Amino acid sequence: YDIQGIRILLAEDNALNAEIAKTLLEDAGAVLTVVADGRQAVESFVAAPESFDVIILDLMMPVMGGLAAAKKIRGLDFSIAKDIPIVAMTANAFKEDVQQCLEAGMNAHVAKPFDMAKLRQVLCQLVRSDGNAE
């Protein structure tokens, strides 16, 4: 699964998790912008919506969590906000958590600690095909 050149906005409050994800994704050729909470993710997206191909949101973050950030992005009044793929990245992998992610407008869910192959597959499916990943 080739993620070369995919532009990712990653919101993750845990500095170590953010660094690991950034390193692994950049090593695979992705271009990353990392922020520490959902509000920063929304602000970064609003400031430059054309700069990202996909948004990855941790669900549990201070200031604004991933679900609230996804809802806020989906509620923005420009078309790319409705279409940009949003991926939840969380340790909560229960069925109801996944359902909450989908209801918030997210396209996919990746459990932490994440499996790099699975994350690359999800990113490719979402960005290269503009569809929902399983």
Residue ranges of predicted features:
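C-terminal compact regulatory domains
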Residues: 1-134
